[in-house]
């Protein structure tokens, strides 16, 4: 039996049929830029309906925001204006007559990385349209009471919040070019693009420094679309971090980019199976 897993972001939707730690099939769709909740819900229903099979035992969804993980109710969603606080899991359960779970996308990314890499104490940080983190303590996902344990993008920084400087928003706002375009230019050796990523790395160091003071993880794994630019910002990040963090805390810390393109989908399947095993379904 497989789990149909969804990773819903601000610009794209990833789906996969997942069996254990194996992705059987994957699909990608652009998320409609305009529209209301009804239109977005219809979009999700259409995508899910296209890929449900008799072997599918349930649906697991990651979203960028806070979730009541017991009921699957969305409490606050970031970067998807058409998705309000709503009982998304129950609505989909009623539609497809199957079990549905919902969790924060960064939580599922971290859970997937922990399962694939056997990490016991780590942060999985997603760098995409926004910023989020999943926290793994002693091999278990820690979400906090309101699924907000990793909402580090909302930390105060400069003239706003740190997400504005540590996500794809930084490049469009401060360099007036997309992160994808700057990545291509950096690959060509363009000095302006390389400098933009160096500055990005310095901002990211400030965010990581704050998370180290709170969580003190052994490993930090970066995911999300911006993480593909890891080689262009890691040195600036490390250099800045040395001036911000107590030396021994950095001695055995590893910071790396994810080697698993769909870790969040693996994490979504694992989350569903954990809920199923603990008899959370009615």
What do the PLM-derived regions correspond to, one by one?
Residues 120-169:
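Glycine-rich phosphate-binding loop of actin/hexokinase-like ATP-binding domains
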Residues 31-33, 82, 149-151:
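A short acidic/small-residue loop/turn micro-motif
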Residues 27-29, 78, 145:
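Short hydrophobic alpha-helix segments
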Residues 19, 63, 70, 137-138:
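A cytosolic small-molecule/anion-sensing beta-strand core signal
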Residues 1-58, 69-71, 92-98, 113-123, ...:
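ATP-binding/phosphotransfer module of carbohydrate and carboxylate kinases, centering on a glycine-rich
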Residues 58, 62-73, 77-78:
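Gly/Ser/Thr-rich active-site cleft segment
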Residues 76-81, 100-113, 125:
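Glycine/small-residue-rich loop that forms an oxyanion/phosphate-binding "nest" at active or ligand-binding sites
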Residues 7, 60-64, 103, 124-130:
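Short beta-strand segments
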């Amino acid at each position: 039996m497989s789990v149909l897993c969804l990773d819903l972001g601000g610009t794209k939707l990833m789906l996969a049929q997942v069996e254990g730690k194996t992705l059987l099939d994957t699909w990608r769709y652009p998320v409609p830029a305009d529209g209301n909740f009804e239109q977005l819900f219809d979009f999700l229903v259409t995508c899910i309906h296209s890929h449900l099979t008799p072997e599918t035992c349930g649906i697991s969804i990651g979203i960028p925001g806070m979730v009541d993980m017991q009921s699957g109710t969305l409490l606050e969603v970031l970067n998807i204006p058409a998705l309000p606080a709503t009982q998304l899991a129950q609505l989909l359960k009623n539609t497809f007559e199957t079990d549905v779970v919902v969790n924060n996308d960064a939580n599922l990314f971290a859970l997937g990385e922990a399962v694939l890499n056997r990490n016991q104490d780590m942060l999985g940080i997603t760098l995409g349209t926004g910023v989020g983190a999943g926290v793994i303590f002693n091999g278990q996902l820690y979400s906090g009471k309101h699924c907000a344990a990793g909402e580090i993008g909302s930390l105060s920084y400069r003239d706003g919040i740190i997400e504005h400087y540590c996500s794809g928003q930084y490049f469009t706002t401060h360099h007036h070019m997309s992160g994808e375009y700057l990545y291509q230019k950096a690959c060509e050796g363009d000095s302006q693009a390389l400098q933009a990523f160096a500055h990005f790395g310095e901002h990211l160091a400030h965010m990581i420094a704050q998370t180290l003071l709170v969580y003190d993880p052994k490993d930090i794994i970066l995911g999300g679309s911006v993480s593909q630019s890891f080689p262009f910002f890691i040195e600036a990040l490390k250099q800045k971090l040395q001036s911000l963090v107590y030396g021994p805390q950095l001695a055995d810390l590893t910071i790396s980019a994810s080697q698993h393109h769909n870790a969040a989908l693996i994490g979504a399947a694992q989350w569903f199976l954990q809920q199923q095993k603990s008899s959370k379904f009615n």
